[in-house]
């Protein structure tokens, strides 16, 4: 972490974190294709290298289809291309250049793909799903996409509908809690859902899984790493026979990667180096709070900066989220909270209100840490440094990366501010910084004019890259 101008116990802690070179904007960005209600914008396509590991040692990396520069080179159906162009896609991002030729080739092959947040992973697997469908069977489920939360499942459903808006006969249905009535059938070609609900629907024969062709897991590391979700994903996989299994995520911890390889055997693999996983458009900062109580006082001081755009505050506990929302509301601030204790319909409404700007600050737990795209989010606050497990025994760098990835998306810049208040939280954040080889800028709580100037300069700056409009 960078040196501080103010004095505190943390100033005495030696930090090995390497100072990063500032002022290196993203090289290019393109529209990601998400419709405006979904928070669409531009893709991150900065200076990083995509590493490809072919499952087939006969694979020819010199083949013209090994990497492409235009969507037309892929032989994608004209109706899908029309949807991409209508959503302002101009050319494949770096991850798409490498992934799509492998995803679309025949016979189908499995893939494990890792890339930064906002680089076009969703569009890559959506294009693949649409390209695998047999449109002579409009009421037969043929593609299944699993996500860890109802919010992400709904978002993926929306992206499929948007990219497939000109595909005649396309049917898509969400399989999330409360979306399918007890005795109803799921008669859609593409099913997007959460593992537990999908498992129950297949067991009840509400989903005919006999003709499934493709299975995709978004945020795959999260689902395979959690015992409950991992077991459910394995059960779902055992209930269907598919030609292609796709695993996508921004992170794949070493302890999960072996499980991913077992789940998606003989897969082509696409991934980034660890120190390339963070997005250069996110300016990562931290504040040394006097104590646990002082975190809230500093949060209140930051409120004016949080509402320049929209902001998400991440906490560990549900009661903390509710308490902060209640206190801020009583002080006259327009905020919203959402966490796992909310009913599904409530969660949907809160997120929709946040997308529409009815509330500019959202307090949440890790339920929204992954995959959720809201274009207006300019700041993320880690009120609690992410830790692993109930005992908080060690820092959780993967969750940190996913949390801050809610801002700085689509080629824009954003700010993340993490709160520390004791040696444990400071050391945890420092370990996360070292894990990704990043530097964290310390904001001076004793000089709010300086702090506001630093943060405002980032939030009000132009996009991190330029649109490829020509």
UniProtKB/Swiss-Prot annotation:
* Helicase C-terminal domain residues: 281-459
UniProt short sequence motif DEAD box, positions renumbered to this chain: 218-221
Q: How does it sit in the membrane?
A: Peripheral membrane protein
Helicase ATP-binding domain boundaries: 102-270
EC class of the enzyme, as a word: hydrolase
Q: What chemistry does it catalyse, as a reaction equation?
A: ATP + H2O = ADP + phosphate + H(+)
InterPro entries from the xrefs? DEAD/DEAH_box_helicase_dom (IPR011545), Helicase_ATP-bd (IPR014001), Helicase_C-like (IPR001650), P-loop_NTPase (IPR027417), RNA_helicase_DEAD_Q_motif (IPR014014)
- Main localization is cytoplasm
GO terms of molecular function: ATP binding; ATP hydrolysis activity; inositol hexakisphosphate binding; RNA binding; RNA helicase activity
Q: What does this protein do?
A: ATP-dependent RNA helicase associated with the nuclear pore complex and essential for mRNA export from the nucleus. May participate in a terminal step of mRNA export through the removal of proteins that accompany mRNA through the nucleopore complex. May also be involved in early transcription.
Query: What is the name attached to this protein's record?
Result: ATP-dependent RNA helicase dbp5
* Annotated gene: dbp5
């Amino acid at each position: 972490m960078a040196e501080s101008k103010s004095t505190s116990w943390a100033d005495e802690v030696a930090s090995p974190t390497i100072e990063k070179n500032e002022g290196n904007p993203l090289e290019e960005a393109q529209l990601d294709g998400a419709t405006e209600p979904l928070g669409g914008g531009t893709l991150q396509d900065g200076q990083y290298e995509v590493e490809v590991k072919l499952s087939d040692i006969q694979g020819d990396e010199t083949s013209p289809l090994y990497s492409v520069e235009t969507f037309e080179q892929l032989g994608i159906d004209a109706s899908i291309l029309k949807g991409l162009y209508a959503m302002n896609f101009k050319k494949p991002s770096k991850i798409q250049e490498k992934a799509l030729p492998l995803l679309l080739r025949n016979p189908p092959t499995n893939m494990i793909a890792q890339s930064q947040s906002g680089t076009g992973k969703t569009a890559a697997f959506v294009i693949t799903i649409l390209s695998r469908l047999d449109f002579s069977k409009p009421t037969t489920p043929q593609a299944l996409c699993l996500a860890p939360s109802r919010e992400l499942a709904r978002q993926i459903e929306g992206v499929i509908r948007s990219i497939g808006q000109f595909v005649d006969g396309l049917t898509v249905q969400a399989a999330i809690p409360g979306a399918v009535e007890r005795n109803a059938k799921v008669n859609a070609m593409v099913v997007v859902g959460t593992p537990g609900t999908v498992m129950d629907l297949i067991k009840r024969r509400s989903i005919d899984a006999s003709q499934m062709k493709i299975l995709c897991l978004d945020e795959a590391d999260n689902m395979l790493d959690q015992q409950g979700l991992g077991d459910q994903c394995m059960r779902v996989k055992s209930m269907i026979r598919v030609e292609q299994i796709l695993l996508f995520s921004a992170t794949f911890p070493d302890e999960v990667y072996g499980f991913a390889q077992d789940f998606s055997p003989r897969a082509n693999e696409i991934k980034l180096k660890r120190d390339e996983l963070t997005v250069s458009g996110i300016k990562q900062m931290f504040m040394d709070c006097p104590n646990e109580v002082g975190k809230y006082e500093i949060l209140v001081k930051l409120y004016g900066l949080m509402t320049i755009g929209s902001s998400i505050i991440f906490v560990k506990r549900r009661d903390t989220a509710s308490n902060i929302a209640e206190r801020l509301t009583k002080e006259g601030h327009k905020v919203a909270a959402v966490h796992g204790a909310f009913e599904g319909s409530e969660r949907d409404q809160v997120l929709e209100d946040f997308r529409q700007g009815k509330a500019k600050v959202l307090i949440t737990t890790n339920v929204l840490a992954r995959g959720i795209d809201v274009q207006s989010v300019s700041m993320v606050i880690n009120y609690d440094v992410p830790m692993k497990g109930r005992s908080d025994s060690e820092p959780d760098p993967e969750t940190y990366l996913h949390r801050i990835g809610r801002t700085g998306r689509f080629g824009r810049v954003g700010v993340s501010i993490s709160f520390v208040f004791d040696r444990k939280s400071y050391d945890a954040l420092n370990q996360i910084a070292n894990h990704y080889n990043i530097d964290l800028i310390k904001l001076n709580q004793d000089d709010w004019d300086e702090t506001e100037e630093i943060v405002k300069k980032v939030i009000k700056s132009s996009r991190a890259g330029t649109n490829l409009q020509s």
